[in-house]
Amino acid sequence: MTEAIYAIPDIHGQDALLEDALHRIARDGGKDARIIFLGDLVDRGPNSRAVIDRLMMGQAQGRPWTVLRGNHDQMFVDFLDSGVIQSPHIRSGLSWLHHRLGGAATLASYGLDVSGDVTEWEAARRAVP
């Protein structure tokens, strides 16, 4: 018998939907089911921090989870690394902090209010593990 592999795409900070998906997978494939998270973990949704924390906890517990980085995750990393809010890959010219991209929502989940600017960059670096 072959092992089932589950894939979860584009969570976008939707922690309640992530928990629902994890419960469904556990019912179908067991608590140690292999899951691949296909990136775009953060932005737009209400609780990117809870999504990141949940995935880190699962991996720390030894769950067979593979987490890939999506373009929204990369924009988050770029901001944390150097305060960059403009990506050359975004054709619209919108900054990562624009509500359509969701960076401000991600930072809000860490208790930060950037109000459209990057003055909270150092605070963000301290707040995110």
What is the predicted role of each segment?
Residues 1-54:
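N-terminal active-site segment of His-dependent metallophosphoesterases
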Residues 45, 49-52, 56-129:
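Active-site neighborhood of divalent metal-dependent phosphoester bond hydrolases
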